[in-house]
From Swiss-Prot:
Keywords: Acetylation, Cytoplasm, Isopeptide bond, NAD, Oxidoreductase, Phosphoprotein, Ubl conjugation. GO terms for molecular function: L-lactate dehydrogenase activity. SUPFAM superfamilies: LDH C-terminal domain-like, NAD(P)-binding Rossmann-fold domains. GO terms for cellular component: mitochondrion. Disulfide bonds: none annotated. The modification Phosphoserine is found at residue 310. Belongs to the LDH/MDH superfamily. LDH family. The modification N6-succinyllysine is found at residues 5, 118, 318. The gene is LDHA. Homotetramer. Interacts with PTEN upstream reading frame protein MP31. It comes from the Eukaryota. This is L-lactate dehydrogenase A chain. The modification N6-acetyllysine is found at residues 5, 14, 57, 81, 118, 126, 224, 232, 243, 318. Interconverts simultaneously and stereospecifically pyruvate and lactate with concomitant interconversion of NADH and NAD(+).
Length: 332
């Protein structure tokens, strides 16, 4: 007896269903799900896989997204505790880890998250040996280093979300002051994601007009307009949002989808993301810090050599020394 499906549909070929543009998100907390929905809304994948250790939450999140399939263009959404669901991913985004508590520094989280990565990374590598790894868990610069060490991947394929969000926050606040959309406000925050990030005042511009040239005191203590406050707000904003709502999610999710778009579509846009910076700015250790990187289908293909003042360079070097001080103590 022919089934309804057989009566309705005449099959022409037996297809091998291998995804061409698969993305995996590891960790379905607030950040992971914000990344997932942002990626779905941008139509970046033909398959989305979710992985977590909390099975009920994982299944619930998957079902909730699947129920929105009519409004999306991602034909397959899967999940599982077992990493076989991640097989053949082009991009694997790691958001799993212990959550930053109110008032806790990102660096405090580190050994807790290293132990989690020792389980996650080998499993990802086993099923998607050619993927790009995008690390979002904090402290992101150290955990990107950890992922690079554990995975054995070349450095172009291990990317930290780094200062992409810090720079976005900076451009938003700059835009608020000037009454201009953030897309037209150019400014870069580099170095360590978080407390010791470095704003590059000399590069701030609107329509190619340098703000520092118009206002030489920009970013200094003697600045009457106190533009330094803008960077201070960038640093404090995550802590403030955590204090108010318990965690941050939407902005980091959108920021990660922005990076995913450059990778999946081979756009070769420039983003401030965390990469291995040894040999630059007098840094001699294996540390990952954010500098402007060209992102495409192979991950980070190139980086832009930013002209920094001696003070900015010194701050970058200090960040590197701090990170290395922590990294060399880590137990793998």
């Amino acid at each position: 007896m022919a089934t309804l499906k057989d009566q309705l549909i005449h099959n022409l070929l037996k297809e091998e269903q291998t995804p061409q543009n698969k993305i995996t998100v590891v960790g379905v907390g607030a950040v992971g799900m914000a990344c997932a929905i942002s990626i779905l809304m941008k139509d970046l994948a033909d398959e989305l896989a979710l992985v977590d250790v909390i099975e009920d939450k994982l299944k619930g999140e998957m079902m909730d997204l699947q129920h929105g399939s009519l409004f999306l263009r991602t034909p397959k959404i899967v999940s599982g505790k077992d990493y076989n669901v991640t097989a053949n991913s082009k991009l694997v985004i790691i958001t799993a880890g212990a959550r930053q508590q109110e008032g806790e520094s990102r660096l405090n989280l580190v050994q807790r998250n290293v132990n989690i990565f020792k389980f996650i990374i080998p499993n990802v590598v086993k099923y998607s040996p050619n993927c790009k790894l995008l690390i979002v868990s904090n402290p992101v610069d150290i955990l990107t280093y950890v992922a690079w060490k554990i995975s054995g991947f070349p450095k172009n394929r291990v990317i930290g979300s780094g200062c992409n969000l810090d720079s976005a926050r900076f451009r938003y606040l700059m835009g608020e002051r000037l009454g201009v959309h953030p897309l037209s406000c150019h400014g870069w925050v580099l170095g360590e994601h978080g407390d010791s990030s470095v704003p590059v005042w000399s590069g701030m511009n609107v329509a190619g007009v340098s703000l520092k040239t118009l206002h030489p005191d920009l970013g200094t203590d003697k600045d009457k307009e106190q533009w330094k406050e803008v960077h201070k707000q960038v640093v404090e904003s995550a802590y403030e949002v955590i204090k108010l709502k318990g965690y941050t999610s939407w902005a980091i999710g959108l920021s990660v989808a922005d990076l995913a778009e450059s990778i999946m579509k081979n756009l070769r846009r420039v983003h401030p993301v965390s990469t291995m910076i040894k040999g630059l700015y007098g840094i001699k250790d294996d540390v990952f810090l954010s500098v402007p990187c060209i992102l495409g289908q192979n991950g980070i293909s190139d980086l832009v050599k930013v002209t920094l003042t001696s003070e900015e360079e010194a701050r970058l070097k200090k960040s590197a020394d701090t990170l290395w001080g922590i990294q060399k103590e880590l137990q793998f």
